Amino acid sequence: LVTLKDTLEKYHTLKNDDFILRMTQEEAEIYGQRALALLQKAKDTLCKKYELELKQPTTVEIFAEQKDFGVRTFGMPDNPGFLGVCFGCVITANSPSSQMPNPANWEAVLWHEFCHTVTLTLTKNRMPRWLSEGISVYEERQANPAWGQSMNPKFREMTLGDDLTPISK
């Protein structure tokens, strides 16, 4: 945690009225303004759609090192498989540079996580995770049909066959 504190102190901060975005200086120069604009578009779109007025800025921290994301998010450095996590008005995310050689689409991740900010705020954190995830995945695809996970031959075969565990079990 002490090392993470030192790392965060070196991060560059971009702000507007609705967001506080923290990331490395190098990454801020590459896509920081695009990230801030995307977050603003997500807020404008989703808050209007769900009739929500957020009363405070949302803090978004994008980590260039997966271990820093892990410590900030889970208190431990080794938690592979997570792209981003939302804690209401705080979002943590792995940057594309922490996911090499196959980075995820950072725009889709930020949109998805901000959607959680909306749903968790509206429900005062009282909603099933599966529902919040489903809404975030849905809103990702509404924002950009190229985002999200599409049906592929393997998933189709599993759906049509007996490879999926029924919800009842």
Each model region followed by its residue ranges:
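Alpha-helical protein-protein interaction scaffolds
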Residues: 1-4
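Hydrophobic positions within repeat-based interaction scaffolds
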Residues: 6-8
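Juxtacatalytic substrate-recognition/specificity segment
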Residues: 10-128, 139-148, 154-165, 169
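Short, well-ordered surface patches within globular domains
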Residues: 129, 133
